[in-house]
């Protein structure tokens, strides 16, 4: 990452991934540091895709949060801030966004999130997303994806909480794989994950490590090809 905030580069990376649905974190809307741009809208427009942005944080006219961009029509199911309990020096409001994509193979639920840095808040955030107001309300036979930057490695409690309800695509495709995505300068941590329910079967998983991806973000995209058990293929990713 070179310190520049370029929506065009992010869109170019997404286009090179051949993905159908992408979750994005740490996007700005109206913030001075990104020239007051609506980053989600600019990325989606360059791709010719649909999108929905949810601000986890607001300060005056400035907003900061997560988005889902999709080749397919998408419908907002839920978007909300999540509980936080981090120490003051790393406190930041976190959020999650839940869309239903109307794919060629049928409807698919996608939740994109960005967990906090504190141990307690990550545990609370994991419990929220697997609970009755989020994924717990989705029938088991409806394809569901939970993806994002969880700031949690595979040995952590938040990861294990989610793993008790959903399956990590990595564990199904290549259990021994490291899939380190952060930081792009020297990838040493696997904190980005794609979880799926039993209605989906991951067939491929990779870290999209390219020179442009290294410049576009401090995380490399994690890309997963999924098969809907009753129909066919879908590609999901994070950038």
Which positions does each model-derived feature cover?
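Active-site metal-binding loops of divalent metal-dependent hydrolases
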Residues: 27, 115, 149-150, 220
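N-terminal, active-site-proximal structural segment of metallo-dependent hydrolase catalytic domains
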Residues: 1-46, 51-53, 57-63, 106, ...
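Active-site neighborhood of phospho(di)ester-bond hydrolases with catalytic His/Asp-centered motifs
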Residues: 23-25, 52-55, 145-149, 168-170
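Catalytic-core segment of enzymes that process non-peptidic bonds
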Residues: 49-85
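Active-site environment of divalent metal-dependent phosphoester hydrolases
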Residues: 1, 29-35, 59-62, 118-121, ...
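Beta-strand-turn-beta hairpins that frame and shape the catalytic cleft
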Residues: 62-64, 71-75, 91-112, 226-231
């Amino acid at each position: 990452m070179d310190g520049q905030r370029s929506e065009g580069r992010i869109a170019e990376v997404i286009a090179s991934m051949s993905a159908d649905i992408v979750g994005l974190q740490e996007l700005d809307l109206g913030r001075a540091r990104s020239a007051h741009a609506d980053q989600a809208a600019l990325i989606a427009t360059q791709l010719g895709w649909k999108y929905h942005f949810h601000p986890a944080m607001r300060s005056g006219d400035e907003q900061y949060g997560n988005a889902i961009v999709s080749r397919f029509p998408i419908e907002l199911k839920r978007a909300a801030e999540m509980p936080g309990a981090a120490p003051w020096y790393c406190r930041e409001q976190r959020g999650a966004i839940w869309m239903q994509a109307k794919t060629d193979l049928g409807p698919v639920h996608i939740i994109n999130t960005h967990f906090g840095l504190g141990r307690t808040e990550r545990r609370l955030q994991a419990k929220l997303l697997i609970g009755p107001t989020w994924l717990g309300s989705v029938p088991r036979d409806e394809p569901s994806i939970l993806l994002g930057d969880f700031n949690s490695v595979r040995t952590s409690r938040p990861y294990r909480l989610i793993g008790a309800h959903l399956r990590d695509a990595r564990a199904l495709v290549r259990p021994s794989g490291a899939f380190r995505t952060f930081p792009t300068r020297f990838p040493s941590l696997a904190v980005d994950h794609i979880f799926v329910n039993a209605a989906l079967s991951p067939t491929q998983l990779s870290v999209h490590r390219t020179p442009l991806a290294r410049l576009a973000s401090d995380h490399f995209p994690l890309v997963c090809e999924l098969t809907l058990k009753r129909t066919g293929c879908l590609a999901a990713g994070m950038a």
